[in-house]
Swiss-Prot record:
Family classification: Belongs to the SeqA family.
GO biological process: negative regulation of DNA-templated DNA replication initiation; regulation of DNA-templated transcription
Subunit note: Homodimer. Polymerizes to form helical filaments.
Keywords, in A-Z order: Cytoplasm, DNA replication inhibitor, DNA-binding
Domain of life: Bacteria
Cellular localisation: Cytoplasm
Gene: seqA
Organism of this sequence: Hamiltonella defensa subsp. Acyrthosiphon pisum (strain 5AT)
Stated name of the protein: Negative modulator of initiation of replication
Keyword Cytoplasm on entry: yes
Function: Negative regulator of replication initiation, which contributes to regulation of DNA replication and ensures that replication initiation occurs exactly once per chromosome per cell cycle. Binds to pairs of hemimethylated GATC sequences in the oriC region, thus preventing assembly of replication proteins and re-initiation at newly replicated origins. Repression is relieved when the region becomes fully methylated.
Keyword Hydrolase attached: no
GO cellular component: cytoplasm
Length: 176
C-alpha cells in the first residue's frame, strides 16, 4: 500500500463518496474511476522514499483508513458491549493524533460536567456516580455512566474536534 497526501478539498470529495464503514480508499477510488482490479495493475506508481512513520503525522486520509481497519477487524467485531467499542475507538483516536485528542478532550464537556480528564479525581468531583474509566493506552479518563446515545455523541464530537469530517464522525459513532 502506498501513502498519498491529498489536499482538504479533494479529501472531502473522496470521503463524501464512502458508501459503508470499512470501505478502503482504494475501493472508493476504483468505484469512482470505474477501475477493475485488472486495470489497477496497469497503473504505474512512482516509488516514494521510505519515511519513518514516527516522524510523520498521520494524514487525515490515512487516519480514516486506520479507523476503517479497526472497525472491520475481528477485535472490534468481538466487542459485545458498547463501552468496550467506545473505549477501543477512543484509544485508537489517541494513537492517531495525541495532541488533537488532548485539545478535543479538554474542550468537550456537558452543561454541568466534564466528559474527559487526565485525572480520575477531577471527574469524580463532578459526581461520584460518573464511573470514570481510564482509556486504554492513554493518560485520559472518561465518564462511563452515560447511555449509549450520549457515548455516540461524545465520540462524534471528539472526532469533529479532531478535524474528522462530520459524515465520517457520524458513521463511526453509529457503530458503537
Amino acid at each position: 500500500m502506498k501513502l498519498i497526501e491529498v489536499d482538504e478539498e479533494l479529501y472531502r470529495y473522496i470521503a463524501a463518496h464512502t458508501q459503508y464503514i470499512g470501505e478502503s480508499a482504494s475501493e472508493i477510488l476504483r468505484r469512482m474511476f470505474s477501475l477493475t482490479q485488472k486495470k489497477q495493475t496497469e497503473i504505474k506508481i512512482k516509488k516514494t522514499p521510505k519515511i519513518h512513520q514516527s516522524s510523520v503525522k498521520a494524514t487525515l486520509f490515512s487516519r480514516i483508513q486506520i479507523l476503517n481497519d479497526i472497525l472491520s477487524s475481528e477485535t472490534y467485531a468481538s466487542k459485545n458491549k458498547v463501552i468496550a467499542r467506545f473505549m477501543l475507538i477512543l484509544s485508537t483516536l489517541y494513537d492517531l493524533d495525541s495532541k488533537a485528542f488532548s485539545v478535543a478532550a479538554e474542550s468537550l464537556q456537558g452543561r454541568k460536567r466534564a466528559y474527559f480528564s487526565g485525572s480520575k479525581n477531577f471527574l469524580l468531583k463532578n459526581g461520584t456516580h460518573t464511573k470514570p474509566k481510564q482509556i486504554p493506552k492513554t493518560p485520559y479518563w472518561v465518564i462511563t455512566n452515560t447511555n449509549s446515545e450520549r457515548k455516540r455523541t461524545m465520540l462524534k464530537n471528539m472526532m469533529i474536534a479532531m478535524k474528522f469530517p462530520n459524515e465520517i464522525a457520524k458513521k463511526v459513532s453509529q457503530t458503537i
